[in-house]
Swiss-Prot record:
This is tRNA dimethylallyltransferase. It holds the Pfam family IPPT. ATP binds at G11, P12, T13, A14, G15, G16, K17, T18. The record marks T102, R124 as: Interaction with substrate tRNA.
């Protein structure tokens, strides 16, 4: 039996990945595997720019709407799910197209997993309580004592990563820096071709980000977050789902901690920071082919042709 194949299409948020993936689907019998840590959550459609019903009807999508926002998803689970799906899609005589920008998941898929523990809800709740009582600076100073290497690498206001680093230390008794130094050996059971959309014109990308954020507001993003608060009373500002870009800022706005103009400004700024981090990851990622989504149609056509050649179609 031939080795399964998968074509990965990576890129920053608002960088044209979905549009190009749909163009590939017009020419090849593909099924899309989402590489997006936000799309796994149900009832979070607008703020995640989830593919529309018509787009999902046109081409099968996987790893979308698979868990409620009260649960968490991990890189380890993604590797397991993605590997299984590539095999299943190949067995149907179709091609797997991995699309997204959650680079931590992609690194786990291609380079292996760190021996890190799964998230612990009780411990995370305790850390959140400490943060509320004593402030984020208290948690950061604690991290400096138990894992100075990781603390030096993180910004003092990086609440999510500071909490995760402390969680790893308390669960294992070892600093995260020790775990990150040892990757679990990993060999992909399928052939992978990696392509990326990397815009040279950052101003154009920033413009797209702002336009998309305003479009989300017009589509009812605030109402979507209000619905989440009603439907899932267990959600807090510290829940993994609400840490998604845009949702965290909307949550603070609905809590009365910021006004509407500041919410919009911070939401756009956070999305730009996400894109910057994604591009930083991409610069460190081995790529088989690259295109600029804002240059001309010829650039993206090269990626479509690369997919055809890779799949032998």
């Amino acid at each position: 039996m031939p080795t399964p194949k998968a074509f990965a299409l990576l890129g920053p948020t608002a960088g044209g990945k979905t549009a190009l993936a749909l163009k590939i689907a017009e020419t090849l019998p593909v099924e899309i595997i989402s590489l997006d840590s936000a799309l796994v959550y149900r009832d979070m459609d607008i703020g995640t720019a989830k593919p529309s019903a018509s787009e999902r009807a046109f081409v099968p999508h996987h790893l979308i709407d698979i868990i409620p926002p009260t649960e968490s998803y991990s890189a380890a689970r993604f590797v397991e799910d993605c590997t299984r799906l590539v095999g299943e899609i190949s067995s149907r005589g179709r091609f797997a197209l991995i699309v997204g920008g959650t680079m931590m998941y992609f690194r786990a898929l291609t380079q292996g997993l760190n021996d890190l523990p799964e998230a612990d809800a009780c411990l995370r709740a305790d850390l959140d309580e400490q943060k509320q009582m004593y402030g984020l600076d208290f948690l950061y100073r604690t991290l400096q004592k138990v894992d100075p290497e990781t603390a030096c690498r993180l910004k003092p206001n990086d609440s999510q990563r500071i909490g995760r680093a402390l969680e790893v230390y308390y669960l294992t008794g070892k600093p995260m820096s020790t775990h990150l130094g040892s990757l679990t050996s990993h060999t992909l059971p399928f052939d992978l071709h990696t392509a990326a959309l990397i815009p040279e014109n950052r101003a154009r990308l920033h413009e797209n980000i702002a336009l998309r954020f305003h479009l989300m507001l017009e589509q009812g993003f605030i109402g979507e977050v209000e619905n989440l608060r009603r439907r899932y009373p267990g959600l807090t500002a510290y829940s993994p789902a609400i840490r998604c870009v845009g949702y965290r800022q909307a949550w603070k706005y609905l809590d009365g901690k910021t006004d509407f103009p500041a919410f919009v400004e911070k939401g756009i700024a956070a999305t730009r920071q996400l894109a910057k981090r994604q591009l930083t990851w991409l610069r460190k990622t081995p790529l088989d082919c690259v295109a600029d989504p804002f240059s001309d149609c010829t650039s993206c056509t090269r990626l479509i042709e690369a997919a055809k050649r890779f799949f032998g179609a």
